[in-house]
From Swiss-Prot:
InterPro entries xrefs: Cyt-f_TM (IPR024058), Cyt_f (IPR002325), Cyt_f_lg_dom (IPR024094), Cyt_f_lg_dom_sf (IPR036826), Rudment_hybrid_motif (IPR011054)
Subunit description: The 4 large subunits of the cytochrome b6-f complex are cytochrome b6, subunit IV (17 kDa polypeptide, petD), cytochrome f and the Rieske protein, while the 4 small subunits are PetG, PetL, PetM and PetN. The complex functions as a dimer.
Source organism per UniProt: Liriodendron tulipifera
Pfam family, one: Apocytochr_F_C
GO biological process terms, semicolon-separated: photosynthesis
GO MF entries: electron transfer activity; heme binding; iron ion binding
Cofactor binding, per record: Binds 1 heme group covalently.
Protein name stated in the entry: Cytochrome f
Subcellular location: Plastid, Chloroplast thylakoid membrane
CC cofactor: heme
Amino acid sequence: MQNRNTFSWVKEQMTRFISVSIMIYVITRTSISNAYPIFAQQGYENPREATGRIVCANCHLANKPVDIEVPQAVLPDTVFEAVVRIPYDMQLKQVLANGKKGALNVGAVLILPEGFELAPPDRISPEMKEKIGNLSFQSYRPTKRNILVVGPVPGQKYSEIVFPILSPDPATKKDVHFLKYPIYVGGNRGRGQIYPDGNKSNNTVYNATAAGIVNRIVRKEKGGYEITIADASDGHQVVDIIPPGPELLVSEGESIKLDQPLTSNPNVGGFGQGDAEIVLQDPLRVQGLLFFLASVILAQIFLVLKKKQFEKVQLSEMNF
């Protein structure tokens, strides 16, 4: 009887342990997968500072190119493509959080004029859906539907990102006018060098926090190093912790300076930003332009016909 109770207790504890483990796995997996776009969203009300700098550059320190392509002009209540290109060498591998090498991911933030927003699914054509692929876009804030973020997504598949955009209609939105508007974009490839809390990631260079002699270098079991430096000023020891990923550049017994790089810089990615302009075109203005062009063409035709008629009259008078 006692053995049976013991078995039941063990079974109950094992079931509880497995359930808790599954819950922790699901929660952590979700938070990790959704973390990247949220970094900027949690820390900044607007991703574009007053200076024009996009805040993603605070974590992605290397400067890399990005390109955006939009139509020169669009009509109201029209779906169009905003194509963001984030070029990089597909052969490159980045340092992952565990110190291993892996493929680069990409992400982008698109800052549209007020009134422009992500097109609803039922307004997107099958051809455009095919270009978009399995990308999932979200608004930067529920109240800022004109600012869209996406990523991280595999860079090898999505180095070109197609945003489906719906233009506003001034007839229904009184704060929107038929004008030329700017569009801003930021795009990154690879992991950042600094987390939003100010701590370094393992995808950056680590510098010495003291000048002196490297007394000891201990390789940690899970990767990374502990570097003990004997301070040159008073001899006290300073320990610098290097996470897995960066390659060590110093050795024991070496004399180093303050802020001297202890590791290589493993970062192969970077962030870039760009801009474009788009005109919200008045349909009546387009119709007026077409009418004007048609009238000019008709006037030219009548002028040619009149000239030929005049030449015929002159020719008949000369023959007479």
